[in-house]
Amino acid sequence: MLGWARFPWRAAGTELDHVSVNVDSMPGGRAAGYNAGDTLVHEVGHWMGLFHTFQGGCEGSGDLVVDTAAEAEPEFDCTEGRDTCPDQPGLDPVHNFMDYSLDSCMTEFTAGQVRRMDTAFAQYRSGRS
């Protein structure tokens, strides 16, 4: 496992309120393909209220962010043009920090994900030290 974090509605203000990452996922670490530090970005995304891009697969409300394209399963590489939910709009978000793509592939959050993190911060983390 490269890292983990609790969602803010489950742990904010408790001893479980933290982000944990494997040192090998940090720059210079031994987790080949996953050692540029993007695991930390991914886990902070969870800590700020984001689900995986593949949450719920091709059905339902997915990651609860409307501008994140649906994805049936995680991407462990960087397959451009991948579309595991052809009946849903958009290609798989392989460049999104909340997928499992290689660190070299992860470059973005959607605008909706940023709004969700802002909302979660205001609700669960604002004013905490």
Regions found by a protein language model. Name each.
Residues 1-3, 11, 31, 60, ...:
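Intrinsically disordered, low-complexity segments enriched in small/polar residues
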Residues 105-129:
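Pan-zinc metallopeptidase signature
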Residues 1-55:
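Active-site-proximal segment of zinc-dependent metalloprotease catalytic domains
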Residues 16-20, 102-109:
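Short, exposed beta-strand "edge-strand" segments with a Pro/Gly-rich flavor and a Y/T-containing core
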Residues 8-10, 38, 82, 115-117, ...:
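General N-terminal targeting signals
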Residues 8-11, 23, 58, 69, ...:
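Solvent-exposed, flexible loop/coil residues
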Residues 34-107:
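The catalytic-center signature of Zn2+-dependent metalloproteases
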